[in-house]
A protein has these predicted regions:
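Accessory beta-strand-rich segments of carbohydrate-active enzymes
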Residues: 43-47, 76, 87, 92-107, ...
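Beta-strand-rich binding/interaction modules
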Residues: 155-157, 246-285, 294, 671-710, ...
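Accessory carbohydrate-binding/adhesion or oligomerization-edge regions at the termini
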Residues: 29-108, 187, 191, 195-197, ...
Length: 967
């Protein structure tokens, strides 16, 4: 057995190979095929009368080009406020809020909760084309191949109905043999119905929902007539057996008559710098009419190549059935890969593996459906790999074959799911049609895609309701007994869902998130207490969900089916609140906080013993469910500007140095201490690896450096490398320092900021009058031209409804009905003279936790349009109130500074607040204190008295996470 490196010298060539193989895998073995792409007759059947009126006998009076969807071809209805969407809405204020009236006008509709399609249609549509069957197909089996229709198809050839299919996961294939004669012309009519009917997968399932791809009507991918010999091979399944250096091949010979035949199996690698050819094997068979199951062994030899994330070597298996003068040759792609579980870990080919994943939600705005070509998927997987990931979960949908081909080429571990979120309507395990449908769909997708090495895991879907635990237990039991090529879990679920006792592994929330709402940031803790009692591998469900402010420059990218009119609404709201020019600043500042949260949550996962992996929600944005801007990449998998792949890989990659640090804020009479560990899930152990560290300031001045240690680093996490200590007495001014840890001879490097403040601070009041309200003395001081500092922590009324944590909005405030927090960090001008004594960037960083977390904000809606606070909180983009925690102004004849941060309590313990207090006083006593904006005293007073009122969502229903734990 050899594990070799893949040759990536020419990406275009590799993509070309992949594109060729998409044809080889599904078409090879057929004597003939021809595409039906192009112009089709077309007609919308709004009243569903076409069957009764026998439209299959008539020529349809419109036309459409296929492949494609109705929205893609601008067919369907204009979007109005009466459009019936496929998806849940938990904030219906759009329909009632007077501000939104301009977005509800006919012909000008813009939606805030997901992207707005150009056209929308749910119902029946008919597609029709005249086709001549080639004369040389005589004696062949003839099929109609529809790669991905949506959703239910019924096919007629002339007036003969051939049946109905409704898979959301695999191609619809109809046998036309008995209904056609080669050399003759036929009218093929396809009726497609995209309504949710008896089989309800759930309105929020990513296979159908308007939250992401949209519930479209049409056919995408390949549309073909295909011909194969009537005696042919089908359902070829390859079962790698690495320990015995062979592959077991199971297949079926389909025959119309009794005969004899011989099967020859051979294989060769095709995407590696070392080519490996497998000696062919032969076996003769007596063939009966109908199905003839066949099992053969293919010895791979000692030099076979393995497939994994580091060396994704692939084979092309050729199966040749010879029967007299007829030959049927088929090819399938497979990899010699073993994906197993031992204890609480996954093992790939015997190597312990941690999954670093993201959730894919079928969010492709340009087309409104998942890409059908290999190149597009290869791009996605390579971007994910560049960000340190090796795994992708497909949330309540199964991607097309192109995704599996691309993941095989890149070396990416996939978890497709049944096409269902059986909730918000349907219930799993209650005897509804969804029970049988989900089982049938997972069987079908495994039959279709089961040979792909990247298909490593399977779940039935997302977060079910009903009597679902018993159902998924039977589901897992069936698959464990049926197909050993991958591992199985019942459903991917949130924390309030029950445990699934038969799971081989768990995808569950609960062991995720940051505890910063109640405790200061540190990097010592982990999630072990939450997963200690779990015996199977635990993969975190939908980790992250940290929000960033919208990037309005992104709007121009939406040139296809779905438009970012939600972004246009959010931009209007920001403009109407006189902050339009700050949109990019808000995006960048909130993005820095988002990236910080992802860093610390991922590192917390990596330093947890026996934590098998995580699935981010998500590396890229999610367009629906209110608009969930949770990605460090936009929905197109493109950078936003505040973090790049190299920076992300510092804390998310196969090998990550980790530091357990008790806190990130120090007085200069303390000692900084960090215990250094490593999470290493690379291709091999690291031998004699030397780990070094450096501590420096923002200018690059080095305060300490040295060697942590030299070690043989095995595969796994929690491997201790040593520690770093530094006394801080030499730091006599407030400083941000940075600890960087690097493993020499590798790409593994990581870093952490920490802050040092003087242990002794003198607060000089000078000429400043300090109060906690705008009292009579404050007004008198201002009238006389003096300086006033108002420390109003806990006393603010106007802005009281805005709940601010240090961490940003989770998912979004629309979907979660204004559940706190409501802000996405702060923005400030770091060059403002106030911050000369308070080191900061323009965005939130860990030193701000003491001042920001659960601090009140002040609302400045009534202030002049040009007013900008010194420390500005970034509100949820659905409201974009002008809010902040610190501002300066000219009031009467004097100068005022006011803060809602607590800068005065417990100064001996709260050294950040104490330093901010000093910085404010020193600034106010300096010549630099020259506020530009003049504010009336009445507006200052209103901050203590005015009540804004709560935001209304109007909808009574709510997401499952806000309901009692009934799942």
């Amino acid at each position: 057995m050899k594990n070799i490196s893949t040759l990536y010298i020419m990406k275009r060539l590799l993509v070309s190979i992949a594109i060729v193989f998409i044809s080889i895998l599904t078409v090879a073995g057929q004597n003939h095929s021809f595409s039906l792409s192009g112009k089709w007759n077309f007609r919308i059947d709004r009243e569903d009368t076409g069957v009764k009126e026998q439209w299959f006998k008539k020529s349809l009076d419109n036309s459409i080009n296929l492949p494609g969807s109705m929205p893609e071809k601008l067919k369907g209805d204009e979007v109005t406020v009466r459009t019936q969407w496929t998806g849940s809405l938990y904030d219906s204020s759009y329909y009632f809020n007077p501000y939104m009236e301009k977005y509800r006008i006919e012909g000008q509709v813009k939606l805030p909760f997901f992207l707005t399609p150009d056209k929308h249609y749910v119902g029946v549509a008919w597609y029709q084309k005249k086709v001549t069957i080639p004369a040389d197909w005589k004696g062949e089996r003839i099929t109609l191949f529809l790669e991905r229709p949506h959703i239910e198809t019924t096919v007629w050839v002339n007036q003969q109905e051939l049946g109905m299919q409704n898979s959301l996961c695999v191609p619809h294939v109809y046998d036309l043999t008995a209904a056609t004669t080669p050399g003759k012309t036929y009218l093929i009519t396809i009726r497609i119905d995209n309504r949710i009917k008896e089989i309800n997968v759930g309105p929020d399932s990513h296979s159908i929902t308007d939250q992401t791809q949209g519930n479209w009507n049409g056919i995408v991918g390949r549309i073909e007539l295909q011909a194969t010999p009537k005696i042919h091979l089908e359902d070829i399944q390859v079962y790698p057996d690495l320990s015995n250096q062979k592959a077991l091949v199971r297949m079926n010979i389909q025959s119309a008559s009794s005969t004899k035949g011989e099967i020859t199996l051979s294989a060769e690698s095709f995407n590696t710098d070392i080519q490996h050819k497998v000696a062919p094997v032969h076996q003769s068979f007596n063939i009966r009419p109908g199905d003839n199951p066949v099992e053969m062994e293919l010895p791979m030899g000692k030099e076979f190549l393995t497939w994994d994330e580091f060396s994704p070597a692939l084979y092309k298996l050729t199966a040749k059935l010879t029967n007299g003068k007829q030959t049927d040759t088929q090819q399938v792609q497979f990899g010699m890969r073993d994906f197993k579980i031992e204890g609480k870990w996954f093992y790939v080919n015997g190597r312990k593996t941690m999954l670093r994943g993201t959730v894919e939600n079928c969010d492709f705005p340009l087309t409104g459906y998942a890409p059908m070509d290999v190149a597009s998927w290869e791009r996605v997987f390579r971007i994910c790999r560049n960000y340190g990931l090796n795994h992708m979960r497909f949330h309540s949908f199964c991607p097309p074959e192109a995704a599996f081909i691309a993941a095989d080429l890149v070396g990416f571990y996939l978890q497709p799911e049944g096409p269902s979120w059986p909730n918000h309507g349907p219930k799993l395990g209650n005897g509804q049609p969804i029970d049988k449908y989900l089982m049938d769909e997972t069987i079908a997708l495994t039959k279709e895609y089961g040979n792909y090495a990247s298909y490593c895991m399977l779940a039935c879907g997302n977060e079910p309701s009903g009597r679902w635990v018993a159902w998924v237990s039977k589901f897992v039991d069936y698959w464990k007994a049926t197909d050993p090529r991958r591992v199985y879990t019942g459903a991917s679920v949130g924390n309030s869902w029950q445990w699934q006792p038969h799971n081989e592994y768990h995808v569950k929330a609960g062991a995720r998130g940051l505890s910063w709402a109640g405790a200061q940031p540190e990097s010592e803790s982990d999630y072990r207490a939450r997963i200690d009692t779990v015996k199977q591998p635990y993969v975190s469900h939908e980790t992250g969900q940290w929000c960033v402010f919208p990037n309005f420059n992104e709007i121009r990218k939406y040139t296809g089916v779905n438009k970012a009119k939600n972004f246009e609404i959010f931009r209007d709201i920001l403009n109407d609140n006189h902050m339009g020019s700050q949109s990019h600043d808000f995006m960048m500042a909130s993005g820095k906080l988002q990236a910080l949260c992802y860093k610390h949550e991922i590192e917390k996962t990596l330093r947890t013993p026996d934590y098998a992996g995580f699935q981010l929600l998500a590396l890229n944005d999610y367009s629906g469910q209110g608009t969930a801007l949770v990605g460090v990449l936009d929905v197109f998998f493109e950078e936003k500007g505040y973090i790049n792949a190299e920076q992300f890989r510092r804390f998310c990659s196969p090998t990550v140095p980790l530091a357990r640090i008790p806190k990130f804020v120090y007085a200069n009479n303390e000692t900084f201490h960090a215990d250094i560990e490593v999470s290493h899930f690379g291709a091999a152990p690291l031998k004699s690896a030397k780990t070094v560290y450096t501590i420096k300031d923002k200018f690059g001045k080095v305060y300490a450096h040295g060697t942590v240690g030299t070690h043989h680093i095995p595969i796994g996490n929690l491997y201790s490398l040593g520690s770093v200590d530094m006394t801080l007495e030499a730091i006599d001014t407030p400083q941000k320092l940075n600890l960087e840890v690097r493993i020499e001879g590798s790409d593994a490097v990581n870093d952490w900021d920490f802050w040092v403040y003087p242990s002794q601070v003198e607060l000089v009041q000078g000429t400043v009058y300090t109060t906690d309200t705008l009292d009579a003395k404050a007004l008198a001081v201002l009238q006389d031209g003096g300086n006033v500092l108002i420390t109003a922590a806990g006393k603010i009324q106007y802005g009281k409804e805005v709940k601010q944590y240090f961490t940003p909005v989770f998912w979004n405030t629309s979907w979660f009905k204004m559940r706190p927090p409501h802000t996405t960090g702060i923005f400030l001008n770091e060059y403002h003279p106030l911050f000369r004594e308070f080191p900061t960037e323009y965005h939130s960083n860990l030193q701000w936790w003491e001042l920001l977390n659960k601090a009140q904000v002040m609302q400045f809606t009534d202030f002049p349009a040009t007013f900008q606070p010194t420390v500005q909180s970034i509100d949820t983009w659905f409201i974009s109130r002008k809010i902040g925690m610190l501002f300066e102004a000219k009031v009467l004849n004097g100068k005022l500074m006011m803060t809602s941060m607590d800068i005065t309590s417990q100064p001996e313990k709260r050294i950040v607040a104490r330093q901010m207090h000093k910085a404010i006083l020193d600034y106010m006593n300096s010549d630099a204190f020259r506020p530009a904006e003049k504010i009336a005293p009445e507006l200052i007073q209103a901050l203590f008295t005015k009540v804004a009122g709560d935001v209304k969502s109007y909808t009574k229903d709510s997401p499952d996470e806000l309901k009692p734990k009934i799942n």
